[in-house]
Amino acid sequence: MRSPYNFIVKPLNNKRYNNTKKIGGIDFVTSTSQENHIASNREAIVISLPIIYNGPIEIGDTLLVHHNVFKFYYDMKGRQKSCKSFFRDNLFFVDSEQFYMYKHNNKWYSHDRYCFVKPVKTKKSIIYKNTSEEPLVAEMIYPNTYLKKQ
């Protein structure tokens, strides 16, 4: 089963939400809200590649997806519905614009035009700075292919 334009993925650990934390061998629920974007699972396992896709991502790789990909929502009548990305049996369509990074062979890579930076700590100077990080200064951690060519 392959889609012409979308990746077919399933949530990591088959869970749409990461809303539990194990403390002392007991699972505690950290959020019961399905609207809470912080509890949404953001990692997906690639099940199938798009037919037109020709790139480095392979079946079994992990994608870092948008927080709305796996979410439930409620319609106008209060009925629970799956998001527009839902396909069937805990499988979802993911467009190339809906994910930012992918993990291949246990190493993360940025996807498409996205890049990821790490803030730089404020350096001591004569001028007092009331911040812990330098404004508008960062270290490139995961560059995209366009930036690598520059």
Range-by-range predicted roles:
Residues M1-Q150:
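Acidic-enriched and Gly/Ser
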